[in-house]
């Protein structure tokens, strides 16, 4: 029986590289690509099947920044499959990133320069906006849409006889100081991306606490500094091209500069091969690339408090109740 893998954000960047790498590891998989743009997803599916003709690749339309789209997409997944073996929660945004020049010039002459470039800590601010659902866009896209997706797909994911895995694309940029239980959407702050990724780490801990006994395990990863649409929003592609020699040099000191989506997907692929029961739920798995170009995975203990994680999880459950009432009313009117 083919293992079924659902990947959000599968049509570009890390998600696209992950698809190719998983099929290279096991072309007997059924990959389900959850994407907003059907034509783009179709082109990806055709390319994957051309290189891996024995695989099965399907598409479900889903926009994780739109909760009705998430629910509709999940219903379609439940119609097609009886179980999911892997759910890669990879889709994400960093809208309108602004470089903090003061922090940049202060940091570049400090002893923390390598850490600053590896994590972008304090370097980037973003201008968030409100979605049609009434949420902060970064919070809904990076975290809450995925949370609703997990809740919708629980019947396909929870099988104690044969565990399923949730695998998140988080970030080294996840900082405790940018998250607050009083403002989980980071509406009052300027670093919603960092906040959403720290929230991802918290949710990961809570999901393991609440679902391991049901056969569902969750892990978080960081792809490192990768050239994707996300980073091209910070600086134009030609600037990154000019910086590549410097980045390759930095690799000898900081292995977070994975650069390519293929390298960045290393931890995501590594987790595909692990027994989830053997993994530490308080560890984030980091993709790394050495100065000589060798890829590897390193575990890093997360700066998370389990009680805070549980409180955050309960807050999300309350938010979910409100959302379901709104969606039911909308469906009734339509």
Curated annotation (Swiss-Prot):
Residues 1-229 are extracellular. Keywords: Endoplasmic reticulum, Glycoprotein, Lipid biosynthesis, Lipid metabolism, Membrane, NAD, NADP, Oxidoreductase, Steroid biosynthesis, Transmembrane, Transmembrane helix. Residues 251-334 are cytoplasmic. It is found in: Endoplasmic reticulum membrane. Signal peptide: none annotated. Substrate binds at residue 171. Its main location: endoplasmic reticulum. Most abundant in ovaries of pregnant animals. Pfam families: adh_short. Pathway: Steroid biosynthesis; estrogen biosynthesis; Steroid biosynthesis; zymosterol biosynthesis; zymosterol from lanosterol: step 5/6. NAD(+) binds at residues 8-15. It is a single-pass membrane protein. Coiled coil: none annotated. Bifunctional enzyme involved in steroid-hormone metabolism and cholesterol biosynthesis. Catalyzes the NADP(H)-dependent reduction of estrogens and androgens and regulates the biological potency of these steroids. Converts estrone (E1) to a more potent estrogen, 17beta-estradiol (E2). Converts dihydrotestosterone (DHT) to an inactive form. Also participates in the post-squalene cholesterol biosynthesis, as a 3-ketosteroid reductase. Binds to the short form of prolactin receptor. PANTHER family: 3-KETO-STEROID REDUCTASE, 3-KETO-STEROID REDUCTASE_17-BETA-HYDROXYSTEROID DEHYDROGENASE 7. This is 3-keto-steroid reductase/17-beta-hydroxysteroid dehydrogenase 7. The gene is Hsd17b7.
